[in-house]
């Protein structure tokens, strides 16, 4: 793509991001749909931060569909950067749900999902379990090591964690062990 083409696309993306902030539901939904066609990964972080503030169910649904439709593996970095940010802690469940609903493989982030499950509440652990169950691999040995450390820390520092969360963490530990055993077979 020419420099002018990239510049034109960036201007279009910036305009669509401005339209999202308009407060007009029709305009916001049209802008989200425009980002599906004209957007690039630079729009993901501001869009995720906007989603955190959304109270309109139509806009929320449109954003859920937008993130579930992602196919570009390069989008993973921006989404994980927002997901791991403590400022979105109360919003992580939606981001995690969008991750397991999309077609992008997040296998490179196995350890981060295990850590989020260990450090978060029951619903975060449930969403992380679903993400982990849907990972395709392959995995680096370091992912297993970091996952085991997160699981060990969870067991050592577990306070009054619910029985349900403890069960989820047990399931995650079994999956990680199975993934590691299958990894060792190659």
Show the residue positions of the predicted features.
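Residues at alpha-helix boundaries and short interhelical turns
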Residues: 54, 86, 103, 159-162
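Structural detector for internal amphipathic alpha-helices that build alpha-solenoid repeat scaffolds
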Residues: 2-7, 28-38, 49, 58-72, ...
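Short inter-helical turns and helix N-cap capping residues of alpha-solenoid HEAT/ARM repeat scaffolds
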Residues: 23-24, 55-56, 87-88, 120-121
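Short acidic, glycine/proline-enriched loop segments that cap or flank alpha-helices
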Residues: 116-120, 138-139, 160-163
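Alpha-helical oligomerization segments
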Residues: 141-147, 153-186
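General structural signal for alpha-helix termini and helix-helix connectors
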Residues: 53, 119, 134-137, 157
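N-terminal acidic leader/helix
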Residues: 16-23, 118, 122-129
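Amphipathic alpha-helical scaffolding segments comprising HEAT/armadillo-like alpha-solenoid repeats
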Residues: 2-19, 38-51, 72-85, 105-118, ...
């Amino acid at each position: 793509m020419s420099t002018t083409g990239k510049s034109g696309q960036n201007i279009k993306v910036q305009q669509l991001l401005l339209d999202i902030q308009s407060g007009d539901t029709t305009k916001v939904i049209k802008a989200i749909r425009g980002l599906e066609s004209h957007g690039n990964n630079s729009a993901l972080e501001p869009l995720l931060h906007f989603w955190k503030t959304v109270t309109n169910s139509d806009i929320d649904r449109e954003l859920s569909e937008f993130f579930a439709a992602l196919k570009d593996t390069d989008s993973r970095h921006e989404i994980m950067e927002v997901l791991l940010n403590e400022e979105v802690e109360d919003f992580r469940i939606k981001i995690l749900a969008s991750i397991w609903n999309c077609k992008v493989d997040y296998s490179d982030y196995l350890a981060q999902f295990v850590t989020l499950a260990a450090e978060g509440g029951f619903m975060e652990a449930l969403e992380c379990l679903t993400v982990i169950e849907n990972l395709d691999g392959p995995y680096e040995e370091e992912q297993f090591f970091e996952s085991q450390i997160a699981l060990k820390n969870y067991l050592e520092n577990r306070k009054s964690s619910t029985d349900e969360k403890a069960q989820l963490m047990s399931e995650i530990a079994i999956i990680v062990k199975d993934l590691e055993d299958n990894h060792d077979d190659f």
